[in-house]
């Protein structure tokens, strides 16, 4: 697999690397590992004993499995989910970006710029009619305008389209854990 360059712990893959094989650790997940992942995604603040009770293990084997899932990179980190509205970030914007330049050097510069912008919550390279999609959160239109001006001055862009979310209908953080 050819990696362009890590940016803030994220890896950007070259376009020829779309077929990424399953990581070996994914093949080793058994039913108990999957239960642990489901429980942790619901509430990562549970004690190891509580998690063990829910999945049918005592504390030590449960803790060893959690450590292995972390070491294998299946569990990336444990975080607190914060209500964006309660901290004054009431506007969500989906920003579509089109570029005339598709070189690796341009992508590195663009990825560095976007990754340094704290308003950007998610950043994707897309297939289809746009090249990149960003999910951005800001306090108000004035804050978005400041963000927009930073974005368009970072690198040459062909087109930027902003779509403002009117209402959040569904938002989950727990991944659907596939059966073994």
Regions found by a protein language model. Give the residues of each.
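A compositional/biophysical signature of low hydrophobicity enriched in polar/charged and small residues
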Residues: 1-180
